[in-house]
Amino acid sequence: MSSSPLSKKRRVSGPDPKPGSNCSPAQSALSEVSSVPTNGMAKNGSEADIDESLYSRQLYVLGHEAMKMLQTSSVLVSGLRGLGVEIAKNIILGGVKAVTLHDQGTTQWADLSSQFYLREEDIGKNRAEVSQPRLAELNSYVPVTAYTGPLVEDFLSSFQVVVLTNSPLEAQLRVGEFCHSRGIKLVVADTRGLFGQLFCDFGEEMVLTDSNGEQPLSAMVSMVTKDNPGVVTCLDEARHGFETGDFVSFSEVQGMIQLNGCQPMEIKVLGPYTFSICDTSNFSDYIRGGIVSQVKVPKKISFKSLPASLVEPDFVMTDFAKYSRPAQLHIGFQALHQFCALHNQPPRPRNEEDATELVGLAQAVNARSPPSVKQNSLDEDLIRKLAYVAAGDLAPINAFIGGLAAQEVMKACSGKFMPIMQWLYFDALECLPEDKEALTEEKCLPRQNRYDGQVAVFGSDFQEKLSKQKYFLVGAGAIGCELLKNFAMIGLGCGEGGEVVVTDMDTIEKSNLNRQFLFRPWDVTKLKSDTAAAAVRQMNPYIQVTSHQNRVGPDTERIYDDDFFQNLDGVANALDNIDARMYMDRRCVYYRKPLLESGTLGTKGNVQVVIPFLTESYSSSQDPPEKSIPICTLKNFPNAIEHTLQWARDEFEGLFKQPAENVNQYLTDSKFVERTLRLAGTQPLEVLEAVQRSLVLQRPQTWGDCVTWACHHWHTQYCNNIRQLLHNFPPDQLTSSGAPFWSGPKRCPHPLTFDVNNTLHLDYVMAAANLFAQTYGLTGSQDRAAVASLLQSVQVPEFTPKSGVKIHVSDQELQSANASVDDSRLEELKATLPSPDKLPGFKMYPIDFEKDDDSNFHMDFIVAASNLRAENYDISPADRHKSKLIAGKIIPAIATTTAAVVGLVCLELYKVVQGHQQLDSYKNGFLNLALPFFGFSEPLAAPRHQYYNQEWTLWDRFEVQGLQPNGEEMTLKQFLDYFKTEHKLEITMLSQGVSMLYSFFMPAAKLKERLDQPMTEIVSRVSKRKLGRHVRALVLELCCNDESGEDVEVPYVRYTIR
């Protein structure tokens, strides 16, 4: 995949949007010429520079306005241990104006447990000074400086946001009071072993521009009553999705025109398709039509200062199963600060004397607390556990709390998303051994090595076990990079016999650098897996990491074979598609290995843990399929920009990829035509017509021919086809029931007139002509003036709409029409195609769509094609940025979510390595940092099935030895008899993959032939594939009857052949 040069920037956005509007002009208005970049295409202009090629995926989360506000905010991060460096990393990647690192302490052994930018040779050096150059590499747009002096008021005054980590309560209160009085936003973050704490104070009056980050909803109106209040009814194609308290605006309403362009109005939801608005009793009568759109209205929120909030706290829940815990930990953390002040150190790990003292201090804090904080009964067991682990420093806890804290910093800078109001407490006590007696003070003593912060919590035996683990990490993108960092910090596979194997076939692109933090600008075009492996060796030189570049799937099962999987202790997925996830899930179920699964989408993230014989698998539950756009909507009746963008993507494939591929196959494969004629419906006609067009009717000889073709195609799509559609269905057409045909979701189009001086029209011709030329190996041009001159001489044929042209109104109509094919037309086409031997050496060059290269004309074509069609149908156009999101199917992403999610994954990893056996020890997690929302649940148990008295789950199977003691392989008859005698099951159908090996309705002759054949021979014959030497066993699926003839569900068969 190609990528843009690192220095290239786009100027984006424009003047401030209207108050109450959620979209910038760049989102709502068509891109126009202000500067012409290297490929001659027009772009938007603006005052603020945002490097879109770097921040692309994050911009889809935050938006341009929030991003500009980030770029004007200077942030102080105080405390550069594991938590501080995590927060600093995330906000530097995020692109704030500048970051100052503050720490007066020096590197200790325990810091290396989670501070990934400190090394053994740094012990004794200042943490901020050592970390500064390594953090500065993350983003060349963000100056990073180190400061080792005291936090005096003059110094603090120069920042918009101050972050305190691992700081004493006394310092927090002093800084908090000062920041609140000066309008400086404050985030306080702390981690203590398996516990985390977060506090936010963003001032007396903060303007929140968007509380949830979701795209504003819109719906089509079918009725508005004249009433007080008026009731709006939406078309029943889909629920409106609004909530009471939302604000909406109206457009395109016919009749009740007072609604169009009115100020945003608050609504009350009455049902899934109805809601009430203002008093409409004096408005005109509603006739038809209209679009109602949600409007994000800014609102003001207020925060208490840290001293005030300490005695009157508000909590955000992280786990509803621990409802009373935040209030208890609010007391516990205050007591812990007192203990540290008294002893100049936290309680010693697992030390009973220190734990008892902390409980006493907590009781005293509770006793003098005001009623709003005071607990009726202090959870002494919880406080004792806090004492046991408070000296610990765990990378996964720091990743989770650090991801959250960094997102809060971004909220403070931008006013985007709802902040944490105001305290958050988190714990992961389920990570402790299920055997309560397993840990002793002796086992948790510091060893003066890099894992001391972790040994303090889990003991030295567990550290040894971690070092010997063998793990397979699939993917080295954003989640993969974070997982590798955490693996290195916790010591996974870092000892003798341990190993982490990471595979990823992708190379690094510039847009990756914003969140895949192991990569640097100079790594662009290098392999991800190799680069990531080299980077984590810098973090922990002891990690045994091996990098591969293989795609996981049936094609690589000779590499990731039985031996490979049987040697593993577990698998972690870091994938970006469902198919690969489900494949790895099947492999883990087959080899009975734990699987750690996770994913992110913008500020949303999820974690799932799959444990053999205990939980369901990843594939046990699936999301409902995405709703596809009906073909007729795309072809004739679009009503949303998503429709025109999908149409443009289909155009790209149908013009610049599929015809070239078909031509090349026609020229090189003698059976191509024969194969094509066997395709269903009208496909043979469409394919052969495209080949004829490419080789005969439209084959260009010069660049001028390509410009002519592009101009003609423009007229076909944006003028002639629309005129034909309006000929079939005039604007005043009525349906059989007397209703207007062009109403509801059907928008009446109008044809466009080509104008060489219209930037968008020229954009289209430039992009289409260059891409068309590329498919023929001709040289294109980026000279807009020269192309405009060529267009003056292009003769456009006259078009007259024809009668008798069938235009399908529904997909059902289209499908029934597709059933009939004109055979005489097919014969005519075959006769007119030139013989391949008359075109020696000729080939075409199919183009694969690549969204991230701004110089290749791909997105230029998509934007122009989509926006011209949008103009046909009076649909609001989309700028390049939004078009790329939708047409490129980009997954919005931000470093903060990835860090937090991977922190949760690695907490589950602690449990997996220890071998936790209780289902309620594990936690599947879901979070949305924008809301903020956190939800945890124990994984679902594997569903249980039964035949006879035998219970089984997806983890069970029949083990059948194919090779008999005499060295001969089992025949099909022996296999069927084996199940009858051993399991009292009569097999009615038997399959391997998609190959049917046996069925009760099989023809007698075929059955007789197969019964005496060895099983592997039947598999090879039916599948027409030879079994590879790496295949030691086959997976066979059965349909069975029990002795009473009833159909019973049974496990699969693992049939061993070597």
Curated annotation (Swiss-Prot):
This is Ubiquitin-like modifier-activating enzyme 1. Residues 1-46 are annotated as: Disordered. Its EC number is 6.2.1.45. InterPro entries: E1_4HB, E1_FCCH, E1_FCCH_sf, ThiF/MoeB/HesA, ThiF_NAD_FAD-bd, Ub-activating_enz_E1_C, Ub-E1_IAD_1, UBA_E1_C_sf. Induction: May be modulated by the thyroid hormone receptor. The modification Phosphoserine is found at S4, S13, S21, S24, S46, S810, S816, S820, S835. PROSITE patterns: UBIQUITIN_ACTIVAT_1 (PS00536), UBIQUITIN_ACTIVAT_2 (PS00865). The modification N6-succinyllysine is found at K528. The keyword tRNA-binding does not apply. The modification Phosphotyrosine is found at Y55. GO terms for biological process: DNA damage response. Residues 63-611 are annotated as: 2 approximate repeats. PANTHER family: UBIQUITIN-ACTIVATING ENZYME E1, UBIQUITIN-LIKE MODIFIER-ACTIVATING ENZYME 1. It catalyses: ATP + ubiquitin + [E1 ubiquitin-activating enzyme]-L-cysteine = AMP + diphosphate + S-ubiquitinyl-[E1 ubiquitin-activating enzyme]-L-cysteine. One of its GO terms (molecular function) is ubiquitin activating enzyme activity. SUPFAM superfamilies: Activating enzymes of the ubiquitin-like proteins. Belongs to the ubiquitin-activating E1 family.
